[in-house]
Amino acid sequence: MPTETTAAINEISIAHSPDSDDAFMFYGLASEKVQVPGYSFTHTLTDIETLNQKAMREAFYDVTAISFHAYPYVQDKYALMPCGGSVGEGYGPMIVAKRGYSLDEVRRVKIAIPGQLTTANLVLQMALPGVETEFVPFDQIIPQVLAGKYDAGLIIHEGQLTYGRDGLTCVLDMGTWWQEQTGLPLPLGGNAIRRDLGTPVHRMMNQALRDSVGYALKHREEALAHAMQYARDLDTPSANRFVGMYVNERTLDYGEDGKEAIRRLLAMGHERGVIPHPVRVDFAE
Protein backbone atom coordinates (compact mmCIF):
# COMPACT_ATOMS: atom_id res chain seq x y z
CA MET A 1 0.00 0.00 0.00
CA PRO A 2 1.43 3.43 -0.85
CA THR A 3 2.35 5.59 2.11
CA GLU A 4 2.72 8.90 0.29
CA THR A 5 0.32 10.81 -1.91
CA THR A 6 2.96 10.99 -4.65
CA ALA A 7 3.55 7.23 -4.72
CA ALA A 8 2.62 5.36 -7.88
CA ILE A 9 -0.69 3.70 -7.11
CA ASN A 10 -1.46 0.61 -9.14
CA GLU A 11 -3.56 -1.48 -6.76
CA ILE A 12 -6.58 -0.17 -4.88
CA SER A 13 -7.79 -2.21 -1.92
CA ILE A 14 -11.56 -2.23 -1.44
CA ALA A 15 -13.46 -3.66 1.53
CA HIS A 16 -17.21 -4.07 1.83
CA SER A 17 -19.72 -6.25 3.60
CA PRO A 18 -20.76 -9.71 2.33
CA ASP A 19 -24.37 -8.90 1.60
CA SER A 20 -26.31 -8.91 -1.63
CA ASP A 21 -26.61 -5.16 -2.14
CA ASP A 22 -22.86 -4.54 -1.75
CA ALA A 23 -22.08 -7.54 -3.97
CA PHE A 24 -24.43 -6.12 -6.61
CA MET A 25 -22.93 -2.63 -6.29
CA PHE A 26 -19.33 -3.81 -6.71
CA TYR A 27 -20.06 -6.46 -9.34
CA GLY A 28 -18.74 -4.38 -12.22
CA LEU A 29 -15.35 -3.94 -10.55
CA ALA A 30 -15.16 -7.41 -9.00
CA SER A 31 -15.93 -9.09 -12.34
CA GLU A 32 -13.58 -6.73 -14.20
CA LYS A 33 -16.43 -5.77 -16.50
CA VAL A 34 -15.48 -2.26 -15.38
CA GLN A 35 -11.78 -1.55 -15.75
CA VAL A 36 -9.58 1.48 -15.17
CA PRO A 37 -6.33 1.63 -17.16
CA GLY A 38 -3.33 1.54 -14.84
CA TYR A 39 -5.26 0.29 -11.81
CA SER A 40 -6.27 -3.03 -10.36
CA PHE A 41 -8.68 -3.64 -7.49
CA THR A 42 -8.62 -6.16 -4.67
CA HIS A 43 -11.80 -6.96 -2.75
CA THR A 44 -12.12 -8.00 0.90
CA LEU A 45 -15.54 -8.96 2.27
CA THR A 46 -16.09 -8.51 6.02
CA ASP A 47 -19.10 -7.62 8.15
CA ILE A 48 -19.76 -3.91 8.53
CA GLU A 49 -19.02 -3.58 12.24
CA THR A 50 -15.60 -5.19 11.73
CA LEU A 51 -14.94 -2.69 8.94
CA ASN A 52 -16.09 0.19 11.16
CA GLN A 53 -13.76 -0.86 13.96
CA LYS A 54 -10.82 -1.47 11.61
CA ALA A 55 -11.20 1.95 10.01
CA MET A 56 -11.15 3.52 13.48
CA ARG A 57 -7.81 1.89 14.26
CA GLU A 58 -6.02 2.46 10.96
CA ALA A 59 -6.48 3.44 7.33
CA PHE A 60 -5.80 -0.12 6.20
CA TYR A 61 -8.04 -0.25 3.12
CA ASP A 62 -7.89 2.39 0.42
CA VAL A 63 -11.67 2.27 0.05
CA THR A 64 -13.89 0.86 2.77
CA ALA A 65 -17.58 0.52 3.38
CA ILE A 66 -18.51 2.14 6.68
CA SER A 67 -21.64 2.94 8.61
CA PHE A 68 -22.31 6.67 8.61
CA HIS A 69 -22.30 6.45 12.42
CA ALA A 70 -18.63 5.42 12.19
CA TYR A 71 -17.60 8.38 10.06
CA PRO A 72 -17.04 10.82 12.98
CA TYR A 73 -14.39 8.45 14.32
CA VAL A 74 -12.50 8.02 11.03
CA GLN A 75 -12.89 11.45 9.43
CA ASP A 76 -9.24 12.31 10.08
CA LYS A 77 -8.17 9.44 7.81
CA TYR A 78 -11.07 9.02 5.40
CA ALA A 79 -13.39 11.22 3.34
CA LEU A 80 -16.82 10.12 2.22
CA MET A 81 -17.27 9.21 -1.41
CA PRO A 82 -20.21 10.99 -3.07
CA CYS A 83 -21.58 7.71 -4.40
CA GLY A 84 -21.99 4.08 -3.42
CA GLY A 85 -24.21 4.61 -0.38
CA SER A 86 -27.20 2.68 0.92
CA VAL A 87 -30.10 4.98 1.76
CA GLY A 88 -33.53 4.05 3.08
CA GLU A 89 -36.45 5.95 1.56
CA GLY A 90 -38.81 5.75 4.53
CA TYR A 91 -37.56 2.30 5.52
CA GLY A 92 -34.48 0.92 7.23
CA PRO A 93 -33.28 -1.22 10.14
CA MET A 94 -36.03 -2.49 12.42
CA ILE A 95 -36.59 -3.48 16.01
CA VAL A 96 -38.28 -6.88 15.85
CA ALA A 97 -39.66 -9.13 18.57
CA LYS A 98 -41.77 -12.23 19.04
CA ARG A 99 -44.63 -10.10 20.30
CA GLY A 100 -45.90 -6.62 19.61
CA TYR A 101 -44.23 -4.45 22.22
CA SER A 102 -45.27 -0.83 22.59
CA LEU A 103 -42.41 1.67 22.48
CA ASP A 104 -42.68 2.14 26.24
CA GLU A 105 -42.39 -1.61 26.74
CA VAL A 106 -39.46 -2.09 24.38
CA ARG A 107 -37.51 0.63 26.20
CA ARG A 108 -37.37 -1.72 29.19
CA VAL A 109 -35.96 -4.82 27.47
CA LYS A 110 -32.45 -5.62 26.30
CA ILE A 111 -32.11 -5.25 22.53
CA ALA A 112 -29.58 -7.21 20.48
CA ILE A 113 -27.77 -4.82 18.13
CA PRO A 114 -25.46 -5.52 15.17
CA GLY A 115 -22.71 -3.15 16.35
CA GLN A 116 -22.08 -0.03 18.39
CA LEU A 117 -20.98 1.95 15.34
CA THR A 118 -23.78 0.89 13.01
CA THR A 119 -26.12 3.64 11.88
CA ALA A 120 -28.95 1.40 13.04
CA ASN A 121 -27.66 1.76 16.60
CA LEU A 122 -27.21 5.53 16.26
CA VAL A 123 -30.85 5.95 15.26
CA LEU A 124 -31.95 3.52 17.97
CA GLN A 125 -30.15 5.60 20.62
CA MET A 126 -31.86 8.75 19.34
CA ALA A 127 -35.29 7.14 19.11
CA LEU A 128 -35.11 5.31 22.46
CA PRO A 129 -32.52 7.11 24.63
CA GLY A 130 -31.00 4.99 27.37
CA VAL A 131 -32.23 1.66 26.01
CA GLU A 132 -30.12 -1.34 27.07
CA THR A 133 -28.30 -3.04 24.20
CA GLU A 134 -25.88 -5.88 23.62
CA PHE A 135 -23.77 -6.64 20.56
CA VAL A 136 -24.68 -9.75 18.57
CA PRO A 137 -23.33 -10.58 15.08
CA PHE A 138 -25.94 -9.34 12.63
CA ASP A 139 -26.74 -12.78 11.22
CA GLN A 140 -27.36 -14.18 14.72
CA ILE A 141 -29.86 -11.57 15.89
CA ILE A 142 -33.02 -13.17 14.52
CA PRO A 143 -32.03 -16.70 15.68
CA GLN A 144 -31.25 -15.44 19.18
CA VAL A 145 -34.51 -13.50 19.45
CA LEU A 146 -36.37 -16.62 18.31
CA ALA A 147 -34.47 -18.67 20.90
CA GLY A 148 -35.55 -16.27 23.63
CA LYS A 149 -32.08 -15.03 24.54
CA TYR A 150 -33.19 -11.48 23.72
CA ASP A 151 -36.66 -10.00 23.84
CA ALA A 152 -35.99 -7.81 20.80
CA GLY A 153 -33.38 -7.35 18.11
CA LEU A 154 -32.26 -4.55 15.80
CA ILE A 155 -31.99 -6.07 12.34
CA ILE A 156 -30.13 -4.89 9.25
CA HIS A 157 -29.43 -6.33 5.80
CA GLU A 158 -31.70 -9.04 4.40
CA GLY A 159 -33.40 -9.65 7.75
CA GLN A 160 -35.56 -6.64 6.92
CA LEU A 161 -37.40 -8.86 4.43
CA THR A 162 -37.31 -12.21 6.27
CA TYR A 163 -38.31 -11.43 9.86
CA GLY A 164 -42.02 -11.91 9.13
CA ARG A 165 -41.67 -15.46 7.86
CA ASP A 166 -39.88 -16.27 11.12
CA GLY A 167 -42.93 -15.13 13.05
CA LEU A 168 -41.42 -11.88 14.32
CA THR A 169 -43.18 -8.52 14.56
CA CYS A 170 -41.77 -5.11 13.66
CA VAL A 171 -41.86 -2.87 16.73
CA LEU A 172 -40.23 0.16 15.10
CA ASP A 173 -38.84 0.85 11.63
CA MET A 174 -35.92 3.25 12.01
CA GLY A 175 -36.32 4.60 8.49
CA THR A 176 -39.94 5.47 9.15
CA TRP A 177 -39.06 7.10 12.49
CA TRP A 178 -36.29 9.14 10.87
CA GLN A 179 -38.49 10.31 8.01
CA GLU A 180 -41.19 11.39 10.46
CA GLN A 181 -38.60 13.34 12.45
CA THR A 182 -36.80 15.02 9.56
CA GLY A 183 -38.65 14.48 6.28
CA LEU A 184 -35.40 13.06 4.89
CA PRO A 185 -34.23 9.65 3.68
CA LEU A 186 -32.13 7.62 6.13
CA PRO A 187 -28.47 7.27 5.09
CA LEU A 188 -27.22 3.97 6.48
CA GLY A 189 -23.86 3.09 4.99
CA GLY A 190 -21.45 4.60 2.53
CA ASN A 191 -17.99 4.20 1.12
CA ALA A 192 -15.01 6.16 2.37
CA ILE A 193 -11.64 6.71 0.71
CA ARG A 194 -8.28 7.47 2.26
CA ARG A 195 -7.64 11.19 2.26
CA ASP A 196 -3.92 10.79 1.55
CA LEU A 197 -4.58 9.18 -1.83
CA GLY A 198 -5.22 12.65 -3.21
CA THR A 199 -7.77 14.26 -5.49
CA PRO A 200 -6.84 12.53 -8.79
CA VAL A 201 -7.27 9.08 -7.22
CA HIS A 202 -10.45 10.20 -5.46
CA ARG A 203 -11.95 11.27 -8.78
CA MET A 204 -10.84 8.09 -10.51
CA MET A 205 -12.37 5.95 -7.76
CA ASN A 206 -15.63 7.90 -7.72
CA GLN A 207 -16.04 7.31 -11.44
CA ALA A 208 -15.02 3.65 -11.16
CA LEU A 209 -17.61 3.02 -8.46
CA ARG A 210 -20.31 4.87 -10.38
CA ASP A 211 -19.44 2.81 -13.45
CA SER A 212 -19.63 -0.39 -11.37
CA VAL A 213 -23.07 0.53 -10.01
CA GLY A 214 -24.20 1.63 -13.46
CA TYR A 215 -23.05 -1.65 -15.00
CA ALA A 216 -25.00 -3.64 -12.42
CA LEU A 217 -28.15 -1.58 -12.94
CA LYS A 218 -27.92 -2.02 -16.71
CA HIS A 219 -27.09 -5.75 -16.48
CA ARG A 220 -29.38 -6.52 -13.58
CA GLU A 221 -29.90 -10.24 -14.15
CA GLU A 222 -26.17 -10.88 -14.49
CA ALA A 223 -25.26 -8.82 -11.41
CA LEU A 224 -28.10 -10.29 -9.36
CA ALA A 225 -26.92 -13.83 -10.14
CA HIS A 226 -23.56 -12.85 -8.61
CA ALA A 227 -25.23 -11.20 -5.60
CA MET A 228 -27.36 -14.27 -4.85
CA GLN A 229 -24.41 -16.05 -3.23
CA TYR A 230 -24.63 -13.44 -0.45
CA ALA A 231 -28.43 -13.28 -0.22
CA ARG A 232 -28.82 -15.38 2.96
CA ASP A 233 -31.88 -17.50 2.26
CA LEU A 234 -33.62 -14.95 0.04
CA ASP A 235 -35.13 -16.29 -3.15
CA THR A 236 -34.32 -14.43 -6.35
CA PRO A 237 -37.41 -12.16 -6.37
CA SER A 238 -36.80 -11.19 -2.72
CA ALA A 239 -33.11 -10.57 -3.36
CA ASN A 240 -34.03 -8.42 -6.34
CA ARG A 241 -36.39 -6.43 -4.14
CA PHE A 242 -33.76 -6.01 -1.42
CA VAL A 243 -31.10 -4.91 -3.91
CA GLY A 244 -33.57 -2.44 -5.37
CA MET A 245 -34.16 -0.95 -1.93
CA TYR A 246 -30.50 -0.06 -1.48
CA VAL A 247 -28.86 0.07 -4.93
CA ASN A 248 -30.58 2.56 -7.22
CA GLU A 249 -30.17 6.01 -8.73
CA ARG A 250 -29.34 7.45 -5.30
CA THR A 251 -26.40 5.04 -5.12
CA LEU A 252 -24.97 6.77 -8.18
CA ASP A 253 -25.34 10.17 -6.49
CA TYR A 254 -26.75 11.02 -3.06
CA GLY A 255 -28.36 14.20 -4.32
CA GLU A 256 -28.55 17.34 -2.22
CA ASP A 257 -31.24 15.93 0.06
CA GLY A 258 -29.16 12.79 0.56
CA LYS A 259 -26.10 14.81 1.54
CA GLU A 260 -28.24 16.96 3.82
CA ALA A 261 -29.58 13.78 5.41
CA ILE A 262 -26.03 12.63 6.21
CA ARG A 263 -25.20 16.00 7.76
CA ARG A 264 -28.44 16.07 9.74
CA LEU A 265 -27.99 12.51 10.99
CA LEU A 266 -24.54 13.19 12.38
CA ALA A 267 -25.41 16.64 13.72
CA MET A 268 -28.45 15.25 15.52
CA GLY A 269 -26.36 12.40 16.88
CA HIS A 270 -24.02 14.95 18.40
CA GLU A 271 -26.82 17.18 19.69
CA ARG A 272 -28.42 14.21 21.45
CA GLY A 273 -25.19 13.08 23.06
CA VAL A 274 -24.63 9.89 21.09
CA ILE A 275 -21.65 11.25 19.11
CA PRO A 276 -19.21 12.99 21.47
CA HIS A 277 -17.85 15.66 19.11
CA PRO A 278 -19.08 17.80 16.19
CA VAL A 279 -18.66 16.23 12.78
CA ARG A 280 -17.25 17.83 9.64
CA VAL A 281 -18.92 16.09 6.72
CA ASP A 282 -17.00 16.44 3.48
CA PHE A 283 -16.97 14.46 0.28
CA ALA A 284 -14.02 13.37 -1.84
CA GLU A 285 -15.12 15.03 -5.08
Predicted regions and their residues:
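Hydrophobic/proline-rich hinge and linker segments of small-molecule sensing/allosteric domains
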Residues: 82-103, 179-196
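Bilobed "Venus flytrap"/periplasmic-binding protein-like clamshell domains
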Residues: 8-31, 93-152, 156-158, 260
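Secondary-structure end/capping motifs
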Residues: 197-268
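Hydrophobic residues within well-ordered alpha-helices
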Residues: 55-57, 145-146, 205, 269
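Beta->alpha turn/N-cap motifs
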Residues: 47-49, 55-72, 137-138, 155-161
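A local structural motif
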Residues: 34-45, 127-140, 275-281
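A structural signal for short loop-to-beta-strand junctions that line the ligand-binding cleft
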Residues: 12-13, 77-86, 110
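Pocket-lining segment of extracytoplasmic ligand-binding domains
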Residues: 139-229
